[in-house]
């Protein structure tokens, strides 16, 4: 049930990062932080599974920012379930689709996507 806000974005760190919260205020809440380093866009994902994938933006288009995994910390084994791909698609001025791909036992295991519209309500 996504009738209530389940995804939020906020600019932080003096305008140097964007914080994304997924499943806001739920037990499975996750946080991602987007930031630039030397002109390159990175994303650190703090997963409800307890691991932390670090990703870098791959070549982008006007409509999409794909990310590829650089590393994943806090996994007991490289076979653990973790997020292994991510993209943000810009569907319009007030709508995005966020896609997540997962890997378990070093094989793709599906994923999820969410299309959300901006709510200007403070």
Identify the residue ranges that each predicted region occupies:
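Hydrophobic small-molecule pocket/channel-lining residues, especially in calycin-type beta-barrels
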Residues: 1-122
